[in-house]
Structure formats: structure tokens, C-alpha cells
Amino acid sequence: MSPLRLPVRTIAAFVLLAASTAALAAGPATRDVAAEEANRQLVLTFYDRFFNKHEAVEAAAVVADDYKQHNPHVPDGKKPFVSYFVGAFQKNPESCARIVRSAADGDLVYLHVHATEHPGDRGEAVVDIFRVQDGRIVEHWDVIQPVPEKSANANTMF
């Protein structure tokens, strides 16, 4: 009987399949759903007070002093962050941010937001990501896209 000869690609595929199956069998990491929900609620409350009620100083009580900002227009640190938006709110006192949906995964909280500067403004679609550590917002990323007048499809951005 001759030895079984398999192409290298077939062997590689079997190895990858075996590795994938082992990883799936291990199951997902344990999640602390209660902590994730607490983080989500912390961010939702902060966001509403900060961006809708414009209670920037009060709302920022949950922001870490060494807050790390990934938006290239906003400085790092709690004080510069608050100062930046206090100025923005003075220029746009009717600005608001409607949270369309939110989710949490571990220490990250995700928001999908429709932000407007005034009534009638088409606004911007925003995805904000906050990292929460020990009950404090410590880091932020965002992606911002203007809501266009016309769309290539019938779907909304929200």
C-alpha cells in the first residue's frame, strides 16, 4: 500500500480548521454584563448632561483628569476637553446630540449619535467610543460624517 500524499494546501487547510475548532470549543471569554451595563449607563448620563444640557463642568466629574482624546481637534486632559466644548456650546447654544443606539463590550461603550447645531440642521452622524476604567471615562475615539442632502439609497444614516 502506498503512503497517502496530500497537497500542502490541503494539509494547511486541515491545520487551520483544527485550530479554529479548538478556539471555538474554548468559548467566549467570561463577560461581566453588570459592569458593562454600569459603564453604558455612566456614558449615557454623561453624554446627555454634557452634550444636550450643556452641563459641561458638572458632567465632566466622571471624566479622568488624564483623559486621552483621539479626536484630532480636541486636546487631551479633562480641563482642555471641557474648555473646548464650553466654547463650542457658547457658539452653538442649541446644539444637541440624540443617541440613536448604544452598546457596551468590556470597558468600551459605543454610541451612534445624530448631532445637530440647531433645529433644521441635517447634522452629523457620529460614532463615539469611550473607554471606562474604575467608574471614570478615560479615553475617547470618534468618527464623524455629515448627513448629506441626497443619498444614493433610501436608507437613513440612523
Label every model-predicted segment:
Residues 20-21:
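N-terminal signal peptide c-region/cleavage motif recognized by signal peptidases
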